[in-house]
Amino acid sequence: MNALKDLKVKIFADGADKAGMLQLNANPLIKGMTTNPTLMRKAGLTDFEAFARDILQHITEKPISLEVFSDEFSEMRRQALKINGWAKNVYVKIPITNTRDESSLPLVRELAREGVKLNVTAILTLEQVTGVAKALNSKVPAVVSVFAGRIADTGVDPMPQMRAGKKILAGLPQAELLWASVREVLNIFQADDCGCAIVTVPHDILAKAMKMTGMELKKLSLDTVKLFATDAAAAGYKL
């Protein structure tokens, strides 16, 4: 298995914990950042703009994706243009639909033509990837975030779909396919194997990847046995 530093896929950090983001920003292995409203709420954030502007003061070179949070397309557009103006390294995340399952592609097309760097998110089907590909501006950088982990949650292998998604985007050199919803370290290597440009990884899984990638399995086996023995002794079990 390759070392993380030898992979072709760019590893992004997925989270909204400021301390964690700053620590990971200092790591040359991490090439960018992604956030979303759920992660921000989990981090206890209540002021979207204050958080975003603050983090953009510290992370100035690597791309950061910040997501709109309105469910109305006119307000999504206003938020997108505002977020876009905060820094040159910002990508504006637009969900593939709103909560009424109305397509956001007209908005994506409009913003892309205005030169807004977009991260179109919450994609799970190849039909959605095709729609996004048709809506993007070939001259403007964009990210197409396919939630491979959620596909896998349904019992479906996401690898064929991710490879097909890469082919759909082949005519758009500025559009990058992103493997989202990483569940385990293996997903990072799967994203690399299927040719994704980016994989975005939660902070806790990044920590595990940096610790365990390449670990000798016999040593890991012994560590596991020691863990069981330690916990059994601590519990004071008797027969």
Residue ranges, per PLM feature:
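Catalytic alpha/beta core domains of metabolic enzymes, predominantly
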Residues: E102, P106-R109, V116-A207, T213-A235
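Active-site beta->alpha loop and helix N-cap motifs at the rims of alpha/beta catalytic domains
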Residues: N2-I30, T34-E110, E114, A148-I151
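C-terminal extensions of enzymes
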Residues: K238-L239
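Flexible domain-boundary/linker segments
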Residues: R41, A50, Q128, K208-A209
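Non-transmembrane, interaction-prone segments in cytosolic or luminal domains
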Residues: N36, D47, E75, Y91-V92, ...
